[in-house]
Amino acid sequence: GDRAALHQALVRIRRDFGFDIVNVVDPQGTVLVRANNPDAFGDSMGHYRTIQEVLRTRAAVAGTGILDYSSIRNEGTELAERTLIPVVPTPRARPRSSPREDHAMVIKIAAPIIAGDRLAGILYAAVLLNNNTEFIDRFKRLVFKDEKIHGRDVGTATIFLGDIRVATN
């Protein structure tokens, strides 16, 4: 089909629904177009569990996941930069070989694109949780309802990837 028109549709989906990543892959898991990085296509997302599950069931699936840095780099420079979390050495913390965490924690969905009676492709979308203050602030408001004691917030919310804080308020 028309890659430019498909790209524009994915950009609208990303904007309207607040996703960070929106891609379409073919039935073999090969990337056809990315909303963020339309020039990066032809690589495979067939190893992603959500893609495999859609291929198996022909039904939409959702969940959380971890993407390695090479996968997130395919989504564009901005998301790759947002993924990086500096590791600050602290007492009693497990020693790390890298000065930064470069894996991306995401909330993801994948849904079949059906044409007639055949699987034409898969829509994959995700929200990046690394450094996502908007998400963690919304989560905190849901849990703690903006309660305060003596003018101070009752609670905080933090998302961990292993022992690294990827988002906190």
Name each model-derived stretch.
Residues D20, Y48, S71-T83, V88-R96, ...:
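A short beta-strand signature within small-molecule sensing/ligand-binding domains used
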Residues L84-T90, D102-K140:
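Conserved beta-strands of PAS-like sensory domains
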